Amino acid sequence: MAHKLPARGRPAAEVLADLKTFSSADPDYRHGRLWSLAYYQDEDYAAFLGEAYSAFAGANGLNPTVFKSLKRFENEIIEATAALLHGTPEVCGVVTSGGTESCLLAVKTYRDRARQVPGVGRPDMIMPVAAHVAWFKASEYFDVKVR
């Protein structure tokens, strides 16, 4: 095995230099050289996002009674989205960490709802062959048939 945890920590500058080296072969997403997966506006906006991220990087949204700010963010995002979609006050939602988690939770919710409907049995999803792999992963995890 080539990689082991070092006996002692390394200076931050050394670690950051390694990170820069590691990313040197990555595609140039900052200048329109990547058609998806990364979305870049400009340096000022990237700096703003970095500062906003670092303000909450250590927070954990698992328990909203501890990090009340994260719960507030989630509630405001859900309320704003519901308003955009003309939702009623009874609308509920969840904020996810990204695309795959969103697909997983959507299929789990669909599967759970299907279990409450008499006569449904094993639910199914109709998907195009070009569907994102996350939908197939969700179908396996939650026993939903793909057609």
Residue ranges and their predicted role:
Residues M1-E90:
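N-terminal entrance/gating region of PLP-dependent enzymes' catalytic architecture
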Residues D44-F48, G61-R147:
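PLP-dependent aspartate aminotransferase-fold enzymes
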